[in-house]
Amino acid sequence: MQRVAAGELPQTLRLARPGTMVAFAKQDAVAPGYADAVRAARAGGFAAVLRLAGGRAAVFHDQTIALAHAVPDPEPRAGIHSRFEWTAGLLARALRSLGVEARVGEVPGEYCPGGYSVNARREVKLAGIGQRIVAGGSHVGGVIVVGGAERVRDVLVPVYRALELPWDPGTAGAVENELNGSPSRAWTAVRDAILAEYGRRYDLVDGELDEETLALARRLAPEHRPA
């Protein structure tokens, strides 16, 4: 995001298979139970990190897709809601193309609640997005839970208990549970469907993170580790 906003890199989209982690938000970090929540995440086999944007703790693991879209914009604040709407709509369309009854909107009782969550049947949350803006650009990030809904539930029950946040574990869903096809192919199918939707608006070109970007990421990493 920093390099895109500074004009050093073009607009960049990344869809990745992340590590196993609970990504805490700034609101979580100032909650009285934060230290206990971090310990609960680690006890469940999840690393604890501080996220760029978003309302409350969310889960990443190897059956999820981590989305990061960095966009140059001289007036990023003006486009906050339009970027949320567009990205949430894109994810819902991608999932509908696979046969999921995907909708945009908050499911009552969901974790990390938000009006731009993507759900199935208005019953279970499948994806969430957050946004960070800086001078010169914005970053829209998100997580799509393709499989392993039980892993999300298992770790967030003690984490949310420590943070004293209400939520209904039954609202944590996964795309593979909404599909009739092979779960083993679901991750690639969802990724490709998302790329196809981005491709309707952008000319996508494969790329790799250069060494300067990776070096910057290493320097910034300590800022995302819980104290």
Question: What is each model feature region?
Answer:
Residues P18, D62, A120-E123, V134-A135, ...:
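Short acidic-glycine loop/turn motifs at beta-strand connectors
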Residues D36-A40, G44, L90-L98, A193-R201:
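Generic non-transmembrane alpha-helical segments
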Residues H61-V71, G136-G137, G141:
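DPxDG-like acidic metal-binding loop motif
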Residues T64-P108:
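Contiguous, small/hydrophobic- and glycine-enriched helical/loop subdomains that border
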Residues L98-V100, I129, G136-A227:
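Long, positively charged amphipathic alpha-helical accessory segments at protein N-termini or as interdomain linkers
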